[in-house]
């Protein structure tokens, strides 16, 4: 994109990670072929280059993995918490040691900038394993009664936007509490989960405690519906989450759902404009807006609308879109052709409905899946771009006059995952935050995460909490 500064390329070396030409399923501590021999290709979204060929799990493979996890559960759950903690600490340290390798791998398979995988994702991944390792021998003091018991086998399905981080969010508390795991990564981003399987072997984790099944929706459905799975945890789209909720209804499975969002970022007239602009950019353009808690709705007080939008457009014009492995890149590739098509369709619908589109001027690479940072003005609550989760680098701008109007507009959504408040008045932050129906509310910042803090939503954003002490409950019989 156009910028006041020219940056020489500063690419991270791809050679730091060795991607095998093919990968199997990870079942009972071994990499094995799918029972029916099916495979699929995983592609770099920045170049459309085939990275590797991966075994595709089917129903028979799910059954094998669940049986392996059930066998492992008997010994794993009987281990003292201090012994389970040793494995988690070991995994965390190996992740730190291999963080550069994992960051490059995640960027290649997902498309997000290397700065984000290196500086945000990987430190948080290790932190989650360190954090829950600390809880493993303290479960009696977590507030869930004496001797809380693990549930059994956890079936976990994770999305493509934060593959390794979502894996850590789910596997770390499950193992700390004595459960065993069968995890299905997204079909577009299976590689980091398979590398994690190798880390489990490197850490000496007992066979069957963690099983990784790359595959498509049929494998996920088989896992969720397996009669010997005691716990289901899903992060992904609201539509799939609803289907999962229906499928486990009437069973004794425990369920956690973290689904879509349409987060409101509220900027009051006393907010420092430059600081707010940086928060807005972080809120919606981090990971190309492919974040469930993205601040995709900007609610700005009318009196500062023009000033803030001018500043925001100037800032967007300095963002650099391109090679995700370049350390200077701000905006990487969209994860898949299907997701790019969805973003394009919703943006075109926004224009057709009368919202005014502004996109940063930039040259999109000829190969790969790309979308320029975009914002819509003259948006009403009725516009599709104000209601639907686009899951891309697209910001919808609405205005308000009073705090009550801001709260009403922010809450006028089927989702309730996240929100942000920008103001210099602490009393206003507390008053507004208390009225927002959102699982997490950031004050004068956005998209900040910590393993000690619970995360989850209301309404169609799901239920249950991941992270913090609260994240233990999802994997305990309490």
Model-derived features: positions:
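Terminal low-complexity tails and localization/encapsulation signals of metabolic enzymes
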Residues: 1-53, 86, 90, 127, ...
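Conserved C-terminal structural/oligomerization subdomain of aldehyde/semialdehyde dehydrogenase
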Residues: 47-53, 205, 229, 266, ...
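Residue-level signal for inorganic ion chemistry
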Residues: 48, 80, 84, 106, ...
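Glycine-rich loop-to-alpha-helix module at the N-terminal edge of alpha/beta enzyme cores
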Residues: 49-139
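Short, well-ordered beta-strand elements within core beta-sheets of diverse protein domains
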Residues: 50-57, 72-78, 156, 265-268, ...
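Structural signal for hydrophobic packing residues in well-ordered secondary-structure cores
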Residues: 73, 77, 92-99, 103, ...
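Rossmann-like NAD(P) dinucleotide-binding subdomain of oxidoreductase/dehydrogenase enzymes
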Residues: 138-275, 400
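ALDH superfamily catalytic-core signature
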Residues: 239-380, 409, 443
